[in-house]
């Protein structure tokens, strides 16, 4: 009889900016903005904001502009450039996979068509014209087709930032729409047309707009489309001539929203605690004093929502970094990402953040905490904090911000990829990064296993625990025993036992601190036991 187990491994750096691919194309950048699986490959969008390789910041190579899309074909390959947007298009605010199931008339396709779409805008300061475009990958030959979404006169007072797209089926007409946000210009829509290059036919006028603040998120909940703009959440009223209405407003919390911070960020959908329907979830970040408050909106009747406070992320960070003060916190760059922990099968949603700190106790980069912090939310609305590549040291390269995260699309790999960095207005050359956390699957022959037959790890008690817990185990044979505490994504937290143990029952106490003697945040932790017979 054989069994398969997952073993948490150490973190692995997947991409570091400032290298060349197999075709000698430069891959740099100050930030990884998205990581997206598409047709058994992995794609990432790279921005060159504040990067000195960018010709707009003093770079000498005209081929290096604002943005690239890079590709990883399998887990053992190296990343390579797949699309270079040049020096005219600013950084790609959109990289997303969408799946069309119907054409522009509403007729169901014989088979769904899965497309990878990037989005960016291009201001021409000489002509005074700005255009916003989407780029659709042709998976047959690896090229990208450019489609115009918006074109108009450029104004420094307006935003043309493209931050999200969403496939949505109109519940009245049955037509599938590609919904695209273009800054303060509004919400645009397109339909699937396989007869044209790029396969998407955009409508030149917005469905809704202009807007006061650039939208930062679009989501579908309970078959309704919602998007955020500043302090407001809008709902689409379906039909031949759709319109939008405000269904929730956070202006009671702040009368002013700094457009560069955004207001409502990461608008996403989570299960309603009642067990029926879906709720909206978001991070509230209105201005330079933002502390990253998480709210859940539970739907009531007639498009009324019950606003539920879940947590303030800055307080979690201050608990995680004892003695530190968080002056500003930003996060939820994209969506609240849902995933299932491969070790426990528990369901979580994940966001990344950055924190401006003031006490100079911990490693920092231009006063931002250097570590890449991940915030996990379980289905009970409980939150915990973890770090990419473990707790950062003063000698480590700064990560600063976790912007994106996705499960591996590769058949032979159980892993989660994380990407990020955020220049925050500071010079940031070749700081973009991608790490992955991998779990290896090991097949063991239970009949021939020496270690599995000779020890038994029991449930810890008390559980839940505060501040300490006891772990009991028994040995039927003398062994060298290692017992280690891990967090949910495989970071090693604390080595509890690393010694030769005799036959019989044993107990070890964990006082809830990590290897550095710092108390860990509330959450779920895993115990691993290994035995080597002599």
Regions found by a protein language model. Give the residues of each.
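Structural signature of eukaryotic scaffold interfaces centered on beta-propeller domains
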Residues: 28-38, 90-113, 158-175, 214-222, ...
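Entry beta-strands of beta-propeller and related beta-repeat scaffolds
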Residues: 40-45, 49, 103-124, 171-180, ...
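Structural motif
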Residues: 52-71, 124-136, 185-193, 230-243, ...
